[in-house]
Amino acid sequence: MDSMKRFYFFALSILLILALIIWMGPSRIIRAVYMADWMIIAIALLIHMGVLAVRGLRWGFIIGQPWRMRVNFMVKTIGLFAGNLSPMRSAGEVMNALAGKKLNGIELSEGLSAGLTERFFDLGIGGGLLLLAAVMVPVIRVIALFGAILSVLITYLIYLVNWREEKGLRIYQRIHSIIERLPVSEETLENLYERLTSGIKGMIGYTRSYSNFTSLGVIFILSLLSWLMECLRLYLVFMAFGVETSFSAVIIIFLLANLVGILSALPGGMGSMEVSMAGLFVVFGVPGFLAGSIALVDRIISFWMVTALGAIFSSCYAGEIFDEVRSYILDIRA
């Protein structure tokens, strides 16, 4: 049943992309892509590789291994690959932690702490920028305000789980009370409770170990740099197609499109992000066929290229990573 559901979601994603291409006009999109400045597109691709490097540096800084750039790059790419294949990118942090356990030699709780801290800053910065957009751009005020409120709420929830031990344990206890209603043996439930509560305590303890002004300031700067580099990538794709727009408009479009990707039940926002980006481009005055071309090329760089790299890296370590998952599950059942 789960495999069929995943297949349906993937098929829907592909159908949305095909619908976008048909709506914008395949021949016009091909012509626009052919006429684009491929040198600028290549620079945009390099910029996105730089984004992955910055994210790897941030990950390495949090876990105390900033010098292991190659390993950190691989761990982050594997995590992004998992996020691209899961609804709301929900599997990214877990796979990051598992890959970090194997490649960085850290504890699973440390990897989860690092992943949640990264998500905390990414959502916090995004929420702040969306709030600013809601104030400054009336045409998208409602959706930007909704996105800002949602981002702040999720950021606050991450704060409770990743920094506040008492609150984090209380949240899990409520979730555990729901799990208890499932047809699971009492021994397994007890093992699950002990493993997860000790994991939450370890995760929060590790988070607090680097929660000082200097460390959090560095993480914030790297997170902001990653955001701005992603916006620069999209801005360069606009330039490649000869479309003139302000950098502030690109930031707003990128924020709103990412909001759709986070909320979407489709894997990695596949299909929904392409459609939302093209629609937002049209709202900001970009012709339809160019809007579709820009959206598709940007997603090839930011989504499909990362997915391909992540698939390559994951294939090298898939057996070892899944051995970690299997041993964890067996420990719970034991």
UniProtKB/Swiss-Prot annotation:
* InterPro entries on file: L-PG_synthase/AglD
Q: Does the keyword Transmembrane apply?
A: yes
Q: What is its main location?
A: membrane
Q: Which GO terms describe its cellular component?
A: plasma membrane
UniProt keyword Transmembrane, yes or no? yes
The alphabetical list of record keywords is: Cell membrane, Membrane, Transmembrane, Transmembrane helix
Query: Could you tell me which species this protein originates from?
Result: Methanothermobacter thermautotrophicus (strain ATCC 29096 / DSM 1053 / JCM 10044 / NBRC 100330 / Delta H) (Methanobacterium thermoautotrophicum)
Record membrane topology: Multi-pass membrane protein
UniProt similarity note: Belongs to the UPF0104 family.
Protein name according to UniProt: UPF0104 membrane protein MTH_378
Q: Which Pfam families does this entry report, sorted A to Z? A: LPG_synthase_TM (PF03706)
Signal sequence interval, chain numbering: none
Question: Which residue spans traverse the membrane?
Answer: 7-27, 33-53, 120-140, 142-162, 218-238, 247-267, 277-297, 300-320
